[in-house]
Amino acid sequence: MLLDDLLTDLGPRFRVPVGAIRAGVRHGRMPLFVSWIVTNRCNLRCVYCGCPDIKTSELSTDQALRLVDEMAELGALSVHLTGGEPLVCKDLDQIVARLRSVGVRYGISTNGTLVPKRLRL
């Protein structure tokens, strides 16, 4: 299960949220709506935002696509892609394509500066 892999790869700070998801799934509940920080990177340096200073690794393309599949299998109806600036995520096109292919709706929170370059999303 990808959630177990993520715990191992990403460390102890994810134990509580992943544990809560696992407990909900075991008791017949499912994550209907998911908010996913796909990256902390950003193309801007706003004085009020600390995202660019957060140094975390992003999921590999394979991990991200497996996570989408797992969210769909668990019954997620909608995924909110956020960040940093999600449009700088190198895998965003593939993530969105997979969300579409498994029938999960999605939304993207963006600062808007890269929308003309990534309009097909």
Question: Predicted segment positions?
Answer:
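Conserved alpha-helical substructure of the radical SAM core
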Residues: L3-L119
